[in-house]
């Protein structure tokens, strides 16, 4: 099946997401990345990842591809939930180094393989995996629509997709609180903890520019996925997207 690569539909101004810049940024914050996630989300990032993994209903036979695997939280969680084999892909070498340490500590090295690679050109064969996941990484890809097409290519027919990504809450009560936090508190705390000036200024900018909800569903549909759903979590601060390769 040929997949049409469409341009982003948001019309919002995109921050610089050149692969070299993004990889360098994550290399710089890798040592404190897990701590930052816990601090900035109040520990909710772990809950959201568990929700994504649970949505896949793993049976113990699946081959899982975790793209933008970072420090391998979803890869490890998938293996613990019964995935037979997990391949994690990321283009930040430092993030993968920390992920590998966690895989070894979890004694899952026989079932998890971490590979350096690009989400827009995945180093896996077509129709080779049963499940594909991305947690909080798709918005960092220079061309998210190309990454979605690659996920579709990698999945076998009937394969399942789960993507976690930040959104923009529209609640009249929670929305203003979230916007204030993301614009003022998050960048300041992120800079202090990460010791990196740009990374947590980039975070709210990338969230604000990214397609979410129905707009991202359109990107998944254009890549070929069916049964696409977007489930808002925490009033839409995060979305869980699911789909199937028909």
Feature annotation, model-predicted:
Residues 63-121:
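Class I SAM-dependent methyltransferase SAM/SAH-binding core
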Residues 223-227, 232-246:
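Core SAM-dependent methyltransferase catalytic element
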Residues 33, 132-133:
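Hydrophobic beta-strand segment of the Class I
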Residues 145-160:
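A short glycine-rich, Lys/Arg-flanked "PGG" loop and its adjoining helix->strand segment in the class I
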């Amino acid at each position: 099946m040929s997949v049409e690569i469409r341009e982003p539909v948001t019309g919002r101004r995109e921050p610089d997401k050149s692969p070299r810049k993004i990889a360098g940024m994550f290399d710089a914050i890798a040592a404190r990345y897990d701590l930052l996630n816990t601090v900035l989300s109040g520990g909710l990032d772990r809950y959201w990842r568990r929700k994504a993994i649970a949505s896949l209903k793993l049976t113990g036979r699946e081959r899982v591809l975790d793209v933008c695997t970072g420090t391998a939280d979803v890869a490890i969680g998938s293996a613990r939930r019964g995935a037979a084999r997990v391949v994690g892909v990321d283009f930040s070498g430092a993030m993968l180094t920390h992920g590998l340490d966690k895989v070894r500590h979890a004694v899952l090295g026989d079932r998890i393989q971490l590979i350096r690679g690009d989400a827009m050109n995945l180093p896996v064969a077509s129709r080779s995996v049963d499940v594909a996941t991305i947690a909080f990484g798709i918005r960092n890809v220079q061309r998210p629509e190309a990454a979605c097409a690659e996920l579709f290519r990698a999945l076998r027919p009937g394969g399942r997709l789960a993507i976690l990504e930040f959104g923009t809450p529209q609640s009249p009560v929670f929305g203003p609180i979230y916007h204030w936090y993301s614009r003022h508190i998050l960048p300041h705390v992120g800079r202090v903890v990460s010791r990196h000036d740009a990374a947590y200024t980039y975070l709210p900018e990338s969230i604000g520019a990214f397609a979410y909800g129905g707009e991202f569903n359109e990107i998944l549909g254009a890549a070929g996925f069916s049964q696409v759903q977007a489930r808002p979590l925490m009033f839409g601060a995060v979305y869980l997207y699911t789909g199937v390769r028909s």
